[in-house]
Amino acid sequence: IKETKGDIIIYVDDDALVDSNYIRIYAEHFAAHPDTMAAGGPIEPLYETSEPAWMSPYTKALLTAWMNYGDKVREYPKGRYPGGGNAAYRKEVFDRVGLFNTDLGRKGNLLLASEEKDIFDKMKALGMKVLYLPTPVLHHCIPHAKLEEDYFNRLTLQIGRSERMRTRAIS
């Protein structure tokens, strides 16, 4: 973040694909809406095999980061925020709220999370505008191994640990 030269920082997961107009969509939105401080878009799973029959919207969101709030620009529903793999920020956000808490992020085989939630909570506390944009779609590649019970158990346990660390830091 400190090394970036542009005014807009876009995050894309390393296991994802985006459409050819992805960057342009974010650039045009931020240019036309100077009050938008951050934005995110849909995250659609791209399965190596196929979506399992047991997948519910809840497990789909946990295992694949699936997110879709429709086809209109809007504020995120209460308690929701952009997925970290498909988010764009004005660089000045980090000057105002600080950098990501790297204790919360993924490292090696650890499935910790919530560093984005931490930033968005700080932004919300300052009244910064964060919008959902329906068109910068990210396709999150999901290997079969991420659909197995062992992975689900490790993921949910470590997300819980992350939330504990995050909420202890603000309480």
What would you call each of these model-derived segments?
Residues 13-17:
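The conserved acidic donor/metal-binding loop of glycosyltransferases
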Residues 125-129, 135-136, 148-171:
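Catalytic core of nucleotide-sugar-dependent glycosyltransferases
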Residues 58-80:
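Short, flexible, basic/aromatic active-site loop/helix in glycosyltransferases
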Residues 1-4:
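Glycine-rich, basic loop-to-helix element that forms the pyrophosphate-binding segment
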Residues 86-89, 93-97, 104-136:
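A short, conserved alpha-helix in the catalytic core of glycosyltransferases
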Residues 9:
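Short aromatic/hydrophobic "clamp" motif used to bind/position activated sugar donors
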Residues 21-55:
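Conserved donor NDP-sugar-binding/catalytic core segment of glycosyltransferases
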Residues 82-83, 156:
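An anion-binding catalytic pocket shared by soluble metabolic enzymes
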